[in-house]
Amino acid sequence: MSSVIASRRYAYALLSAADEGGFLDDVTAEMEMIGETLAGSRDLVRVLASPLINGDRKTHILEEIFRGRVGERMMRFLSLIARKKRAGILRGIASEFKVLLDEKNGVVNADVTSATELSGEQAKELVNGLAAYTGKHVRARMTLDPEMIGGVSVQIGDTILDGSIRHQLQVLRRTLSVEEA
């Protein structure tokens, strides 16, 4: 089983248990902190992924790092994944947990690229339009691309909405070349 599939299954099980048990907010904060800790420590990620370190030792390492920072339920979860030889996918579990939580809450992430910085009003209008388009709450991450001639390009999951001038010129060029043929 691929690590992405396993990460998603563990994340789903954790999310479901936390939601049903009424402690989703606590688990969400703890998973976010665990994800940030792993993102900031390549050595920890390597240790957890190492087949040379047994599950008991990984459990001890996780306890040393997270005891007092997470609740007892989360410590049991961390111990479980270490015993099941899945500590190496903990970062993936944290990432998938965030994705599943967003899905549950009706949130989509949009990567918005523009040639120039959008004003607050333009950004708000764009986000509102994307929310109407998707039917979900939109969390937008704005980036600038000086290579763009103008316009805006938006990526939501696998969908790309390209309103850049460069794209419009490419469409026009293709249309004209088809008409010439």
Curated annotation (Swiss-Prot):
Entry-linked InterPro entries: ATP_synth_OSCP/delta_N_sf, ATPase_OSCP/dsu
Pfam families, per database record: OSCP
Superkingdom per UniProt: Bacteria
Localization in the cell: Cell inner membrane
Membrane topology qualifier: Peripheral membrane protein
SUPFAM superfamilies recorded: N-terminal domain of the delta subunit of the F1F0-ATP synthase
One example GO MF annotation: proton-transporting ATP synthase activity, rotational mechanism
Entry keywords, A to Z: ATP synthesis, Cell inner membrane, Cell membrane, CF(1), Hydrogen ion transport, Ion transport, Membrane, Transport
GO CC, any one term: plasma membrane
KW Membrane (keyword) present: yes
Signal peptide: none
Assembly and interaction partners: F-type ATPases have 2 components, F(1) - the catalytic core - and F(0) - the membrane proton channel. F(1) has five subunits: alpha(3), beta(3), gamma(1), delta(1), epsilon(1). F(0) has three main subunits: a(1), b(2) and c(10-14). The alpha and beta chains form an alternating ring which encloses part of the gamma chain. F(1) is attached to F(0) by a central stalk formed by the gamma and epsilon chains, while a peripheral stalk is formed by the delta and b chains.
Purpose: F(1)F(0) ATP synthase produces ATP from ADP in the presence of a proton or sodium gradient. F-type ATPases consist of two structural domains, F(1) containing the extramembraneous catalytic core and F(0) containing the membrane proton channel, linked together by a central stalk and a peripheral stalk. During catalysis, ATP synthesis in the catalytic domain of F(1) is coupled via a rotary mechanism of the central stalk subunits to proton translocation.
Record family assignment: Belongs to the ATPase delta chain family.
Name by which UniProt lists this protein: ATP synthase subunit delta
Organism, as annotated: Chlorobium luteolum (strain DSM 273 / BCRC 81028 / 2530) (Pelodictyon luteolum)
Taxonomic lineage of the native organism: Bacteria, Pseudomonadati, Chlorobiota, Chlorobiia, Chlorobiales
Gene from which this protein is expressed: atpH
